[in-house]
């Protein structure tokens, strides 16, 4: 016997009102605008240090330093070229090493971005232009900056993630 159509419908949590969603969005925008200069500085710093492929020691160190400043535990993979930060329930149990079990993490959301560059000489003339024969022509400096910005906004709401037994991996 086939299940009733109503049994196949996903159960969902109550939806926030449009006004509540707008207020949350407005609050996030205001918070991000408050550190817009820092975001720009991060992007310019990353833009000046383009690295190729999976050899990203400067970029990885830079990301690790920013996560450390935000008190976000992280792990590195792929010879240090991959950095994974944790915010939320999993971070509380990671004890600073950026590693937690699936049970400790609870519900997981993953945000990702690339950090590598292309072997293209930059000729932009910008004061933050790269000078090593490579450049972030594909915007990976912005990927990394956006993730750092998201990390900062999420860290400010970490208690809500812990209460929801959820972890965001960046």
Predicted regions and their residues:
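Acidic/His- and Gly-rich active-site-bordering loop/insert found
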Residues: 2-136, 141, 145-168
């Amino acid at each position: 016997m086939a299940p009733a159509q109503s049994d196949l419908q996903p159960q969902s949590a109550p939806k926030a009102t449009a006004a509540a969603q707008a207020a949350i969005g407005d609050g996030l925008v205001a918070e991000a605008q408050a550190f817009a200069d820092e975001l720009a500085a991060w992007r310019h710093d990353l833009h000046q240090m383009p690295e190729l492929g999976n050899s990203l020691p400067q970029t990885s160190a830079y990301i690790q330093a920013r996560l450390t400043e935000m008190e976000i535990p992280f792990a590195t993979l792929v010879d240090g070229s991959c950095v994974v930060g944790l915010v939320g329930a999993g971070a509380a149990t990671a004890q600073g090493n950026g590693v937690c079990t699936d049970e400790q993490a609870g519900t997981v959301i993953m945000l990702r971005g690339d950090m590598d560059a292309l072997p293209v000489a930059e000729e932009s003339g910008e004061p933050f232009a790269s000078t090593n024969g490579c450049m972030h022509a594909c915007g990976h400096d912005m990927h990394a900056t956006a993730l750092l910005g998201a990390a900062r906004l999420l860290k400010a709401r970490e208690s809500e993630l812990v209460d929801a037994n959820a972890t965001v991996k960046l």
